[in-house]
Amino acid sequence: EQTTMDDVAARAEVSKATLYNYFTSKDSLLMGIAEAALEEICQLIADELKDEPDAVQKLRRVMQTFVLDSIRYLALCRKIAYLNSFEESDLYQTRLEMLRLLGTLVAQAQAQGTLRADVPAQSIVDLLMGLYFTTQFQWPQLAQYSREECIERLDRQFDLTLAGVMTACPE
């Protein structure tokens, strides 16, 4: 909140003029960061995960990427996560895109028979968003976790979160 655009330019090692050429305000900078994170997830799904047959494993990797990417700039990512919850916010569209990405993967998992089809996809997406918000706001030491610790803890929470909506065995 108290970080200025000058601070951002200095940390990014670019001139203030260069920063302002791309981002006219802190809000536009936040939007750019959120859009870049979503683009990275889209690339992950299109490239690295394109041959992964299990949609639940794709969901796991997407959640890992969202959380691991937030660690480096945790305060900023927490602000983005908070702001994109409000329809009035310019960042709200990024939330809708995140929901769409998760919803697509949930629907794939339901079609594969690994997630229960009798549970609305939106309810499962809500569970996953709850997990994401838990990592951002309820894990105070998130920034101190090693990558391995974070993945281990997130995987455990992911499994617990989806336990009630997983099928006993895929159809």
Predicted regions and their residues:
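C-terminal peripheral helix-coil segments that are non-catalytic and often amphipathic
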Residues: 61, 68, 100, 104-112, ...
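Hydrophobic alpha-helical connector segments
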Residues: 32, 43-72, 121-128
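Short secondary-structure transition hinges
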Residues: 67-104, 122-123
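Append "Primarily bacterial transcriptional regulators
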Residues: 7-11, 19
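Short coil/turn motifs that cap or connect alpha-helices
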Residues: 15, 25-26, 54, 120
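Amphipathic, non-transmembrane alpha-helical scaffold segments
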Residues: 30, 34, 38, 88-99, ...
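An amphipathic alpha-helix adjacent to DNA-recognition modules
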Residues: 1-2, 13, 21-46, 60, ...
